[in-house]
């Protein structure tokens, strides 16, 4: 009987399949759903007070002093962050941010937001990501896209 000869690609595929199956069998990491929900609620409350009620100083009580900002227009640190938006709110006192949906995964909280500067403004679609550590917002990323007048499809951005 001759030895079984398999192409290298077939062997590689079997190895990858075996590795994938082992990883799936291990199951997902344990999640602390209660902590994730607490983080989500912390961010939702902060966001509403900060961006809708414009209670920037009060709302920022949950922001870490060494807050790390990934938006290239906003400085790092709690004080510069608050100062930046206090100025923005003075220029746009009717600005608001409607949270369309939110989710949490571990220490990250995700928001999908429709932000407007005034009534009638088409606004911007925003995805904000906050990292929460020990009950404090410590880091932020965002992606911002203007809501266009016309769309290539019938779907909304929200």
Whereabouts are the PLM-identified features?
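Bacterial N-terminal signal peptides that target proteins for export
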Residues: 1-12
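N-terminal signal peptide c-region/cleavage motif recognized by signal peptidases
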Residues: 20-21
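C-terminal and inter-domain tail/linker signature
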Residues: 24-158
């Amino acid at each position: 009987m001759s030895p079984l000869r398999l192409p290298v690609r077939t062997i590689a595929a079997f190895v990858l399949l075996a590795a994938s199956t082992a990883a799936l069998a291990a199951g997902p990491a344990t999640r602390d759903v209660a902590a994730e929900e607490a983080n989500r609620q912390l961010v939702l409350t902060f966001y509403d007070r900060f961006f809708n009620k414009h209670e920037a100083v009060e709302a920022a009580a949950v922001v870490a002093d060494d807050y790390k900002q990934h938006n290239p227009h906003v400085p790092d640190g709690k004080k510069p962050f608050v100062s930046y938006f206090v100025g923005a709110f003075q220029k746009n006192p009717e600005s608001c941010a409607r949270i369309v949906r939110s989710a949490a995964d571990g220490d990250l909280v995700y928001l999908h937001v429709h932000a407007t500067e005034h009534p009638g403004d088409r606004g911007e679609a925003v995805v904000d990501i906050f990292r929460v550590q020990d009950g404090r917002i410590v880091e932020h990323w965002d992606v911002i896209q203007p809501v266009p007048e016309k769309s290539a499809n019938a779907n909304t951005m929200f």
